[in-house]
Swiss-Prot record:
GO terms for molecular function: dGTPase activity. It comes from the Bacteria. Keywords: Hydrolase. Belongs to the dGTPase family. Type 2 subfamily. The keyword Glycosyltransferase does not apply. Residues 68-215 form the HD domain. NCBIfam families: dGTP_triPase, PRK01286.1-1, PRK01286.1-3. Coiled coil: none annotated. HAMAP family: dGTPase_type2 (MF_01212). Pfam families: HD (PF01966), HD_assoc (PF13286). This is Deoxyguanosinetriphosphate triphosphohydrolase-like protein. It comes from Azorhizobium caulinodans (strain ATCC 43989 / DSM 5975 / JCM 20966 / LMG 6465 / NBRC 14845 / NCIMB 13405 / ORS 571).
Amino acid sequence: MAVSGARPRMTWACDPVWTRGRLVPEQEGTRSAFRRDCDRIIHSTAFRRLKHKTQVFVFHEGDHYRTRLTHTLEVAQIARSIARALGLDEDLAEALALAHDLGHPPFAHAGERALDACMADYGGFDHNAQSLRVVTRLERRYAGFDGLNLTWETLEGIAKHNGPLTDRSGKPLGAAGDVLPHAIVAHSAVQDLELWTHAGPEAQVAAISDDIAYDVHDLDDGLRAGLFHLDELEALPLVGAVLAEVRASWPSLETGRVIHEVMRRLITRFVEDVVRETETRARAAKVRSSFDVRMAGAPLVAFSAGMRTAEAAVKGFLFPHMYRHARVNRIMDEAQGVVRDLFALFMARPQEMPADWQLEGAPPERMARRVADYIAGMTDRYALDQHARFFDTTPELR
C-alpha cells in the first residue's frame, strides 16, 4: 500500500469550525483555528530554543546530529503525512507535533531526570506537562493573555501525549503514579481537558509520529556517530529485512547512501502500517466522530501487532547500544550535574536569576517551580554558560 494524496475529511476528524475554542475567546480571521495554533507555536520563543537543545547528542558534538528542533520538524512532517492519508486535520496534527517537546529542559532526558529529582519535594518535573505550562503560562508575548491561548484540542493533545492521565473518577493512571504533574493540575483548575479520555485522532497521530521519528532517526544518528554499525542491525526483524532489500538492489552502494535508503524505507513502512491499522480499527469500532475516538477503550491510531513487535525490537536495540552507551552516559552524567548545580544555586541565591524571574519572599514550593521553569527554558549552551559564570569548573560535554 502506498500513502498518496489527501482524502476527504473523515467524520471522526477534529474540525476547526467546531473547535471547543480558546480560554480567551478570539476572532479567527482568514486562517483556521488549528492553523493559527501552528503559527503561534512556530513564532514562540520556546520553539526557537529547540535549535540548541539536545536530542541525544549535545548540540556542539556535530552539525549533522539531530537537535530537538530538527526532531520536532521531522515529527511534524510524518504527522502531516499520516493525517493527510487518513483524512484528518493536518494543521492540528502539525500543531501537536510542533508543541510536543516545548517543555524539554536542556540535555535531553538526562536534564529532565536531574530536574525531576531536584523537584522531588515540590511536585516533580515532567517535560510533557511542562510543554502545557509553556503554551498556557510561560510564553508572554500577547497583550491580552499569558501563554499562546491555543485551542482546546491542541491543549488536550499536549496534555495526553502518552494517553489518558486519569480514570473516570480522577485517579491518576500509569506513569502519573499517585499524583498528576504540577502543570496538569494547575491548568485543570481553569480548563477541563477531560484527562480520563483518550486524546483526539490528530493527537494520536502526533504521538505515534514521535515514536517513528525517534526510532528511525536515532538509528541514523547512532550509525553516523559510530556507536554501532549496519551489520548489527541485520538481526532486527524489520530493519534487517529492509537492509537486505537495499543491499540486494544496490550491492555496491556506498555506506552513507545505504543508511539513507534504509531509513527512508523504514519511515514508509511505519507510516503505511499505521494508516492500514488505523483504518481497520476505525471500521471495527464504527467511529463517527472525534468524540467516539476519545471514548474508545484503546488508541485508534496504532501500529499493527506485527509492527508493534518490530518497533519494540528497534527500541530494545537502541537502549543498550545508544541511550545507555558508555560515551553517551558519561556526557549525560556530567550534564545532570550541571542542572543540579544550577538548581541549588538559584534556590539559594534567586537574585542571580534575571529580574523578571525573581520572586522575592515566595514560599519554597513556588520558588522551586520558578527555578525549574527558568532552567527548563535554557538551551544547552546557555545552561553551560550560566554554570561557567558561577562555578570554577564546567564540563565540556564532549
